[in-house]
Amino acid sequence: MADHSKNEAAAYALKLLSLRSHSRFELAGKMLRKGYRKELVEEVLDYLVQKQLIDDEAFAKELIGSRSRRKPVGKRKMQFDLIRKGVPENIADALLKEYDGAELCYRAGVRKAAALKGRDESERKKKLEVFLRNRGFDWPVIKETITRLFQTGPECEND
């Protein structure tokens, strides 16, 4: 195992942070895989937290916002993704209290319904249900979305 200096380890962590935000857990994993000693990694990460360059709560907010805009997912899946990325469960729970899964489900449903345009209604409903379930939305929210889309005539049909 290579013997790395604190400055070298900090430079590597800062390089990773310059590319995108990371949780403390993600950075630790990448640094350990790179060959840095655990004690050195912890020391560097403590320093970066102290300097507010690593903030798991800010990272989680950024991830939630990004996913909500780009690829909406259900509350359960979002919580799973946050925890998988190393965000402490208490932070994930607190941030997801206000998570509007119904509106995100509807937005994802509108996009998918547009992609399914031209198919018969029952096939579109089934494919939409599977798509939304795979995105982690709960059945009551999926049912409401499908009803809303097909009751008013899918918005995608008017495009």
UniProtKB/Swiss-Prot annotation:
Q: Name any Gene Ontology BP term.
A: regulation of DNA repair
Query: Which keywords describe this protein according to UniProt?
Result: Cytoplasm
Cytoplasm listed as a keyword = yes
Listed InterPro entries:
RecX_HTH_1st, RecX_HTH_2nd, Regulatory_RecX, WH-like_DNA-bd_sf
Main role?
Modulates RecA activity.
Quote a single Gene Ontology cellular component term: cytoplasm
Homology family: Belongs to the RecX family.
Gene3D superfamilies, A to Z: Winged helix-like DNA-binding domain superfamily/Winged helix DNA-binding domain
Give the organism the record lists. Chlorobium limicola (strain DSM 245 / NBRC 103803 / 6330)
Q: Which gene name does the record give? A: recX
Q: What is this protein called?
A: Regulatory protein RecX
| Localization per Swiss-Prot or TrEMBL | Cytoplasm
